[in-house]
Amino acid sequence: MRAAQTVKAAGVSRAARPVRANVVCKAQKVEFGQAAAAVVAASALVAGSANALTYDELQGLTYLQVKGTGIANTCPVLEKGSTDLSELSAGTYKLENFCIEPTSFTVKEESVFKGGETEFVKTKLMTRLTYTLDAMSGTLKVGSDGSAELKEEDGIDYAATTVQLPGGERVAFLFTIKQFDGKGTLDNIKGDFVVPSYRGSSFLDPKGRGGSTGYDNAVALPARADAEELLKENVKSTKALKGSAVFSVAKVNTATGEIAGVFESIQPSDTDLGAKPPKDIKITGLWYGQLSQ
């Protein structure tokens, strides 16, 4: 996903991170809805890695030091802290600088063999380094019994992304966790979120048809304007869909209020304004945030 080059900025030597999965993890099976996902609860989250920058190190860089390096597409890492989640006191926290960095995109595809099961296949990322969600805010409630509630409220919480399947088909989707509302424990916060339409209602297709503007039907086929097989092409839909995600806290620093972990989400792809069924996209990666009361 990232160029294999070393970036030196503000005295920090940073190797680009093609994969930040050199993390010691404990696997934990989790199910949401019709999709089954495996989420990893990291016992040591990339902390202290030479391949990552902390929040303070990122803030110390100038525009020219960041430009063209891919650093802007990464989340800070937690260098110091504890993996003992019980150190996080019970209470309601404001979550700021909430950042989510994907490290893997897979798409659910049918088996090429008759009667085979569907599975998530690896993809090639076609989008440039602009798919990380950042500057988000929300709330985190921690109960005295170990329960936790996480809500996302605002920020840069969506990013248009495209991946390519092994056969060459490209799948576009709006990577997001908009209005995520999850409950569970700190190492397993499960919930749903809203997936807005990839295209807006004013977008026109190649035949000039749109949701709130443009033609009602294909001009070249006036006699078949009301044909049932063309209905989904003529009547555009910008209806929001639903996705599910699991967040796992791996490390906390009660002195600085920083928190970090891993996540996994499953969401629908673009539907071409309702003209085609969506594909399931599985995204896994890292997240970071800062807590205050």
Curated annotation (Swiss-Prot):
<keyword id="KW-0464">Manganese</keyword>
<keyword id="KW-0604">Photosystem II</keyword>
<dbReference type="GO" id="GO:0042549">
    <property type="term" value="P:photosystem II stabilization"/>
</dbReference>
<dbReference type="InterPro" id="IPR011250">
    <property type="entry name" value="OMP/PagP_b-brl"/>
</dbReference>
<keyword id="KW-0472">Membrane</keyword>
<dbReference type="GO" id="GO:0010207">
    <property type="term" value="P:photosystem II assembly"/>
</dbReference>
<dbReference type="Pfam" id="PF01716">
    <property type="entry name" value="MSP"/>
</dbReference>
<comment type="function">
    <text>Stabilizes the manganese cluster which is the primary site of water splitting.</text>
</comment>
<comment type="similarity">
    <text>Belongs to the PsbO family.</text>
</comment>
<feature type="transit peptide" description="Chloroplast">
    <location>
        <begin position="1"/>
        <end position="53"/>
    </location>
</feature>
<protein>
    <recommendedName>
        <fullName>Oxygen-evolving enhancer protein 1, chloroplastic</fullName>
    </recommendedName>
</protein>
<keyword id="KW-0602">Photosynthesis</keyword>
<keyword id="KW-0150">Chloroplast</keyword>
<keyword id="KW-0809">Transit peptide</keyword>
<dbReference type="InterPro" id="IPR002628">
    <property type="entry name" value="PsbO"/>
</dbReference>
<keyword id="KW-0934">Plastid</keyword>
<dbReference type="GO" id="GO:0010242">
    <property type="term" value="F:oxygen evolving activity"/>
</dbReference>
<dbReference type="GO" id="GO:0009535">
    <property type="term" value="C:chloroplast thylakoid membrane"/>
</dbReference>
<dbReference type="GO" id="GO:0009654">
    <property type="term" value="C:photosystem II oxygen evolving complex"/>
</dbReference>
<keyword id="KW-0793">Thylakoid</keyword>
